[in-house]
């Protein structure tokens, strides 16, 4: 399956949305200053179904990065973990690369997002 599966679903702002509707505002801090963090990991097809490799460790590392970057995440690690699994299921992925991104939105603008 192509990375650009326009018929797929993306988890964004707490819910699954159609891929085509996963957009961010032009005034978002991330667009102007690149203020985002990401992780990259894989899910694999196994005889017992799809398994996300070391999911808890990846989510913990992402949240730790957000803490160091002073970026609040509006979801608990458990909610975020469920979101990853829900997205994999919603797209019927058996094997895939997962790239969660957390970014600063459009509530602040300027080099220092902490006025």
PLM feature spans:
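Conserved alpha/beta cores of soluble small-molecule-handling proteins
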Residues: 1-115
């Amino acid at each position: 399956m192509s990375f650009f599966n326009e018929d797929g679903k993306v988890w964004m702002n707490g819910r699954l949305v159609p891929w085509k509707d996963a957009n961010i505002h032009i005034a978002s801090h991330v667009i102007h200053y690149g203020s985002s963090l990401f992780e990259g990991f894989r899910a694999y097809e196994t005889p017992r179904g799809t398994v996300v490799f070391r999911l808890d460790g990846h989510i913990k590392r992402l949240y730790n990065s957000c803490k160091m970057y002073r970026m609040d995440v509006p979801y608990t690690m458990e909610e975020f973990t469920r979101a990853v699994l829900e997205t994999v299921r919603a797209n019927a992925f058996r094997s895939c690369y997962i790239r969660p991104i957390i970014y600063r939105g459009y509530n602040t603008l300027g080099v220092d997002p902490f006025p």
